[in-house]
Amino acid sequence: MGKIIGIDLGTTNSCVSILENGNVKVIENAEGARTTPSIVAYANDGEILVGQSAKRQAVTNPHNTLFAVKRLIGRRFEEEVVQKDIKLVPYKIVKGGNGDAWVQAGGKDMAPPQISAEVLKKMKKTAEDYLGEPVTEAVITVPAYFNDSQRQATKDAGRIAGLDVKRIINEPTAAALAYGMDKAKGDHTVIVYDLGGGTFDVSVIEIAEVDGEHQFEVLATNGDTFLGGEDFDMRLIDYLVDEFKKESGMDLKNDPLALQRLKEAAEKAKIELSSTQSTDVNLPYITADATGPKHLNVKISRAKLESLVEDLVQRTIEPCRIALKDAGIDASKIDDVILVGGQTRMPLVQKTVADFFGKEARKDVNPDEAVAMGAAIQGAVLAGDVKDVLLLDVSPLTLGIETMGGVMTALIEKNTTIPTKKSQVFSTADDNQGAVTIHVLQGERKQAAQNKSLGKFDLADIPPAPRGVPQIEVTFDIDANGILHVGAKDKATGKAQSIVIKANSGLSDEEIERMVRDAEANAEEDRKFEELAAARNQGDALVHSTRKMVVDAGDKVTAEEKAAIEAAVVALEAAVKGDDKAAIDAKVEELSKVSAPVAQKMYAEQSAEQPQGGAQQAEPEAKHDDVVDAEFEEVKGDDKK
C-alpha cells in the first residue's frame, strides 16, 4: 500500500505533508516553498500555470488568472455570496449548465473542482517528486462549516486530480491533530481558531487520553465560509482606491490591471504591518490620463489598517461564542487556544482572541502548516501506521426533511458525531396519497424555505390508504467524509428509493553586515523615523476611537462639544499626514483635551450600570413517538420527476 498524503487545500495557499518514520514532514514544492499559492492561470499559448508561476504573471493576465476559487466550490450561481464575489474578482464568474457558479478562463467555462484539481495535481506531483513513487491516495481538509455540496465538490476535485480521497476532514480537527501528537499527558479541551485566506471557523475539541490512546472529539464547530484574509485585503484595496481617487480624481475600480497590482501591494502591506508600525504602498505608473502617467503613493499605519478591518475581526467572535454555547463549555474552561491560518499573525486578531478567551494563544503551531500536518496524521491512521489516535468529527449543520406546512423536521442535529445513521417514520397528508416527495434540507431554521435545499426525490406507488396510515421510513446516513445518503422506504410494500447528495456539480552574511553598518550610520535618523511613525500611529488610533466614542455617546454629546471634537479631529488628521512629530503630539493633546468631558460622561454612565445576570432555561426533553404525523405534501402527477 502506498503512502496516504495529507493536503490542506486552502483558499489562498495549499500545503502537502506526509508521515515518515513517525514524524510529520511538510514537503517543499519544486520552487522550494513549503506552501503553494492556490492560483491557476491559463496562458495565451494554452499552458496551465499553477502556484507561484501563476501568481507572478497575474498582473499581465488578470482575466485568465483564477484565485480564491475555493470560495465558489459547491455553490449555486444565484447565491448572494457568489453575486458579491463577481464584483470583487477580475476574472469572470458564470452560471454553469447545472446552475452552479463556474469560472471562465482561456476561452472555456470550468467548474471550480476542475480548478482546485489543478492545485491538487501540483500537490500530488510535489509528494511524488519527494517520495520517488506514485501517490494515489490522500486525505484532504475542508473548513468545518463547509456544507454537503462543498464537501462533495472537494472530493470531486481530488478525483479529477487522480487521487482517491480516503477521507475529507475538518481543518480545525486536523490542526488539533497536529498539535495533539506531542501534547502533555491527560485530558485537554482546545479551541482551534482558524482564520485563513477565505474562510473562518472555530472548533471546540476535546482531546482525551484513554488507555494510552488519544481520542479527539469535536464538541462543536461554527464559522463563516465567506470571511478571511481576502476580505482584509479588499478593505485595504478599497481604502487605496479611495485615497487615489481623492488625490487624482481617477477611479481604479474598473481597471483590472491596476486592481491586480493593488491586490499584491495590499497583501504585502498587510503582512508588513504585523511586524512594523507603518508602511508605504508605492505603485508607480498605476494608470494614466490625458495629462500623463499617475503614481500611487499612500502611507498606511497599523492603526489605520486595524480601523479598516476592526469589524471583520469582531465578526469572528460571535461564532466563537456560539461554539462554546453549543459545546456547553465556559471560555474559562478552555486549556489551550490554537491559531491556524496566516491571517492570525495579525496582532489585532491575536489580541481580540486573547481578550475573548482570557488567555494567550499558543504560538508553537505553525499556522500555515498545521492543517496539512494533521491531514497527514489522519492519512497514517487510515493506513494503519498510527494506532493511538481516534478521530471523532461532527456534522456542522442540522439535516432534515420538509414536512407539512413548510416545516423542517430535523433527523440529524448539528454537532452530531459522524459517521452516523438515523431513521424516522413519517406518514401521508391526504387520503389515498400515492406518492411523497422527500425534500432534503440543511440548516438551523424551522421554516424549510429558509434552509439550504440539498436535493429532492419521490417515493411513488404507495398503496391507497387513509391519511396517516402508510408508514414511510426515512433514513439519513452520513459517512466518515460527511457525505450524506438519504433513503425512503414504504414499510408495507418494501418499496424503497434513495439519493446520495452530490454537488451539482534567507540574507547572505555580506548583506547582513552591510545592513548593520547602515543601521549604525543612520541610527539617529532611524530613531526619529520610529518616533514619527509611533506618533502617527497614536494619532490615527485616537481619531478612530474618538469618532467611535462620539457615535456611541449619541445625544449625550452637545452640538458645541461635537463641533469642537470634529475640528480637533480634522486638525489631527492633517498633522498626521505631515512629517512634524511635535505638531502631531500637539494635536493629539488638543483632541484628548476637548474629548475628555465626553469620555468622562460615558465612564460615569457605565459605572452606574449594574451587571446583569442571566439564568439558563432548561429545555424540556421532547418525547418522540415512533411514528411522527409529519405529513408530506402530495406529489401531483405533473410534479413527478
Swiss-Prot record:
Alphabetically list the UniProt keywords: ATP-binding, Chaperone, Nucleotide-binding, Phosphoprotein, Stress response
Q: Where is this region: Disordered?
A: 602-641
Matching entries from CDD domains are given as: ASKHA_NBD_HSP70_DnaK-like
From start to end residue, where is composition biased (Basic and acidic residues)?
Answer: 620-641
- InterPro entries the UniProt entry points to: ATPase_NBD, Chaperone_DnaK, Heat_shock_70_CS, HSP70_C_sf, HSP70_peptide-bd_sf, Hsp_70_fam
Instruction: Describe how expression is induced or repressed.
Output: By stress conditions e.g. heat shock.
* Domain of life per record: Bacteria
Q: Which residues carry this modification: Phosphothreonine?
A: T199
A single GO molecular-function term is: ATP binding
Low complexity bias: start-end ranges: 604-619
* Pfam family name, one: HSP70
- HAMAP family recorded for this chain? DnaK (MF_00332)
> Per its database record, what is this protein's job?
Acts as a chaperone.
**Family note:** Belongs to the heat shock protein 70 family.
Entry protein name: Chaperone protein DnaK
**Source organism of the structure:** Pseudomonas putida (strain GB-1)
The primary gene name is dnaK
